[in-house]
Design a protein with these regions (language model features):
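Conserved phosphate-chemistry cores used by DNA topoisomerases
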Residues: 1-269
Length: 269
């Protein structure tokens, strides 16, 4: 259920989209109720990717028919319908009137692990579909950056975004590890040994963080990091990548994965 904010205008307000009631509970307690709303998504989010078509001459296909099918695919997900309603928008229109948008910032706040990344990708896929891509084009969609780790040092906690950031933290705070060649057996062994003697907590989800932690790391505008979702200058290239990853062509996606597997540094299985 949507926990709305007190301010009833678009300017200065934020909607946080979170996974489930556990994360939703912490977010609702930790937020600034004046301008921050929270929408927990409970059910499964579907892949709502819709391929844009350009009707060919002498073809039975037309834009209106394609739009109807696209809409049916999007609203087949109860969670997407809930989201559209929370935003104050109408899914049945060809063009969005952004004056109807209830919040200035739409912030996707999923868990920092691979499951959270998957849900984030599905939500971004929805926002890429017309007419909702207008929200991205006009700078309304953001990604929260919650921590995956907490390092306990005495009474203080140091929050770390992900595996890469944890590795960098260890390197910068250990001269012996820093001397070793990155990626070598000696380096990886020293890294694991250092991790084993540190007090590291891995958050399985945002629900494991208490409201104060969630506020200070992810919700507070003074201390948080937000990523604004933007298209690149080469929009066709963006859409080609989205089609490859989220479309129905399995062979195309497999080729992409095989071709880029060599570039993977941190694999979370």
């Amino acid at each position: 259920k949507l926990a709305d904010c007190q301010i009833g205008k678009q300017e200065g307000t934020e909607l946080f989209i979170v996974e489930g009631d556990s994360a939703g509970g912490s977010a609702k307690q930790g937020r600034n109720r004046a301008n921050q709303a929270v929408l927990p998504l409970r059910g499964k989010i579907l892949n709502t990717y819709v391929e844009e078509i350009v009707p060919k001459k002498n073809s039975n296909q037309n834009g209106s028919e394609h739009r109807t099918k696209a809409l049916s695919k999007m609203i087949s997900s109860n969670e997407i319908v809930t989201l559209i309603n929370a935003l104050g928008l109408d899914p049945k229109v060809e063009e969005l009137d952004l004056k109807d948008l209830r919040y200035g910032k739409i912030i996707i706040m999923t868990d920092a692990d691979v499951d959270g990344s998957h849900i984030r990708a599905l939500l971004l896929t929805f926002f890429n579909n017309k007419p909702f891509n207008k929200l991205i084009e006009n700078g309304h969609v953001y990604l929260a950056q919650p921590p995956l780790f907490k390092i306990n040092k005495g009474t203080k906690g140091i929050y770390i975004k992900d595996e890469k950031a944890l590795e960098e933290y260890i390197i910068n705070n250990n001269k012996e590890v820093k001397k070793l060649k990155k990626g070598s057996k000696e380096y990886l062994k020293a890294l694991d040994e250092e991790k084993s003697i540190m007090s590291i907590q891995r958050f399985k989800g945002l629900g494991e963080m208490n409201p104060e932690e969630l506020w200070s790391t992810t919700l507070d505008p003074e201390t948080r990091n937000l990523l604004q979702v933007q298209y690149s200058k080469d929009l066709k290239k963006d859409q080609k990548l989205i089609h490859t990853l989220m479309g129905n062509d399995v062979a195309l996606r497999k080729d992409f994965i095989v071709s880029n597997a060599i570039n993977v540094q941190n694999l979370d299985i």
